[in-house]
Swiss-Prot record:
One family name in Pfam for this protein: SPOUT_MTase
Record carries keyword Cytoplasm: yes
Annotated InterPro entries: Alpha/beta_knot_MTases, RlmH-like, tRNA_m1G_MTases_N
Keywords for this protein: Cytoplasm, Methyltransferase, rRNA processing, S-adenosyl-L-methionine, Transferase
Protein name: Ribosomal RNA large subunit methyltransferase H
EC number, as in UniProt: 2.1.1.177
Cellular component GO terms held in the UniProt record: cytoplasm
Role according to the record: Specifically methylates the pseudouridine at position 1915 (m3Psi1915) in 23S rRNA.
Assembly description: Homodimer.
Any one GO molecular-function label of the UniProt entry: rRNA (pseudouridine-N3-)-methyltransferase activity
Gene: rlmH
Length: 156
């Protein structure tokens, strides 16, 4: 099973890539994290946010792995703890389907994309830069895996 992170945005600062890579290289081969960057749509003065999100939705859908479980990151999603994420991971592995985590652009994710997702998940009640969410998600996936392995990385 692969964990895919589909994120709207490109040309991230080096420190984002460094942080993201730090956690992805720690993951075991059977839970590899793969990042797919989606080029954001141009915002112009006459273009509405719903038009931008719809165009980005098409790009995300084209990049989605077939039959993947879709977890859309959204401020109105379920507010899971790290332990809940760790509890879900073994079931996802047994299911055998890849998991695709979706990170929207500046305007968020298109409502149609959220509606077809298997789950809406909130990363934080705080407003975070989208680039930072990549690093936080990679760290939390690594932490969840270490919990399932009784690895000392996670301390209570």
């Amino acid at each position: 099973m692969k964990l895919h992170i589909l994120a709207v945005g490109h040309k991230m600062p080096d420190w984002i890539a460094t942080g993201f890579d730090e956690y992805t290289k720690r993951m075991p081969p059977e839970l590899r994290i793969e990042l797919r960057e989606i080029k954001p749509e141009q915002r112009s003065s006459g273009r509405q946010a719903d038009s931008v999100m719809a165009a980005e939705r098409l790009k995300i859908e084209a990049a989605l792995p077939k039959n993947a479980r879709i977890v859309a990151l959204d401020e109105r999603g379920k507010d899971w703890t790290t332990m809940q994420l760790a509890g879900a991971l073994p079931g996802w592995q047994q299911d055998g389907r890849d998991v695709a985590f979706l990170i929207g652009g500046a305007d968020g994710l298109d409502p149609q994309l959220k509606a077809r997702s298997d789950m809406l998940l909130r990363v934080s009640s705080l407003t975070l830069p989208h680039a930072m969410v990549r690093v936080l998600l990679a760290e939390q996936l690594y932490r969840a895996w270490t919990i399932t392995q009784n690895h000392p990385y996670h301390r209570v």
